[in-house]
Amino acid sequence: MSMVYINIFLAFIMSLMGLLMYRSHLMSSLLCLEGMMLSLFIMMTMVVLNNHFTLASMTPIILLVFAACEAALGLSLLVMVSNTYGTDYVQNLNLLQC
């Protein structure tokens, strides 16, 4: 396994650990999720290019489309929560809270 794959895997793990540790604010959670998607995109692109998978060449582009949709929904949720409650705490997203 080359050093590039190890670095990208470590970037994914660091983003996952950031998502698990800093989950009180919605903005930091969205940023960690974007880091995970970016490292996953780079890893998929490198695997497709190195192994010459012609049938799977569209897979990284499809992942980017889903990442863009996730980012748009996350930012709209962030704007809605910050306009409603004044903060971006994740605890405000609990629908069962009275």
From Swiss-Prot:
Q: Which reaction does it catalyse?
A: a ubiquinone + NADH + 5 H(+)(in) = a ubiquinol + NAD(+) + 4 H(+)(out)
Enzyme Commission number, as recorded = 7.1.1.2
Keyword Glycosyltransferase in record: no
| Gene Ontology CC, one term | respiratory chain complex I
UniProt-listed InterPro entries? NADH_UbQ_OxRdtase_chain4L/K, NUOK/Mnh_C1-like
Q: Where in the cell is it found?
A: Mitochondrion inner membrane
Look up keyword Transmembrane helix and say if it applies: yes
Could you tell me what this protein is called? NADH-ubiquinone oxidoreductase chain 4L
